[in-house]
Amino acid sequence: MSNQEVELVIIGSGPAGYTAAVYAARAGLAPVVLAGSVTAGGALMTTTEVENFPGFVDGVQGPELMESMRAQAERFGASILLDDAVLVDLDGPVKTVETGSGETFHARAVILTMGSAYRKLGIADEERLTGRGVSWCATCDGFFFREQEIVVVGGGDSAMEEALFLTRFASKVTVVHRRGEFRASKIMAQRVLDHPKIEVVWNSEVAGLIGAEKVEAVSLRNTVTGAERKLPVTGVFVAIGHDPRSEIVTGLVDTDADGYVLVEHPSTRTNLAGVFAAGDLVDHTYRQAITAAGTGCAAAQDAQHYLAALDEAAPALTATEEVFA
């Protein structure tokens, strides 16, 4: 356990956190990145092929992209810790961040990049059957469903990606979507519709999970007629969106009704001086790796300008001496 005085703490990783770390480190701020004990790298750590990140003609694996970003940030002097922020005090000129391992950081500025978490179905037995047929990660669990029939729930690009990846293992993939058309990009949707191992069930939702020790079937409910039917499957992969990981700052910074952190657009400033936010913690519209990286860059520059303004206001002392005096 220790107490450390630093210029900048970045809570979270992913494209936003790592990009913020690159820019902050290059600016000489020596940022400390609390990347997460389990979630380091963010959602892209469970993403297979990333085809729309500029600079990769043939695409890039999500974990590979995140590892490159992490290494780049460390190269410029960022300290990246596989630890979680568990308690924060963001008021006043000095922010305090306590970690799960017992470390305490006192920083002049904080950037929030905790991202978002997989949204759950919210139905009976979902928790009980998690890991027993219910999953949110095709790349993690797809192998276990070789030559089995499975369901993918969702209609966005993530659901399309999951379904296509799972055709490598499953004998049949049924995509269940509550509407009559996909929200996914045309190219991803068409790949799913054209795939011989994928069937789409429109205007339907998973109303129930069936199975004592593991998933044996799902109950599908038609969202138009209300009729229900049983579909025998052994796996259910959920890809219905995300919820922001803002619990640790709820009540401290302003958020919207869904928990997304509010910023003073076009900047990344929150309602608290010296606290900035970026990535999917803020953005529920675009939610792309490249947009997260862009806001991470912006947050680092906003933090840099904020700290520079503090230094100009107190020229007699060094920045650290001034706030920690």
Q: Predicted segment positions?
A:
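Phosphate-coordination loops involved in phosphoryl transfer and adenosine-cofactor binding
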Residues: 5-7, 83, 146-148, 203, ...
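Glycine/small-residue-rich loop that forms an oxyanion/phosphate-binding "nest" at active or ligand-binding sites
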Residues: 80-146
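Residue-level detector of alpha-helix initiation sites
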Residues: 14-15, 39, 116-118, 157-158, ...
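A conserved FAD-binding loop/helix module that cradles the flavin
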Residues: 22, 160-162, 272, 278-325
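Short, well-ordered coil/turn residues at beta-beta hairpins
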Residues: 12, 113-114, 120-122, 153, ...
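FAD-site-proximal beta/loop scaffold in flavoenzymes
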Residues: 5, 122, 127-144, 240-288, ...
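A Rossmann-like FAD-binding core segment of flavoenzymes
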Residues: 70-99, 104-107, 167-265, 305-325
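Beta1-alpha1 glycine-rich phosphate/pyrophosphate-binding loop at the start
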Residues: 6-76, 148-149, 160-186, 256, ...
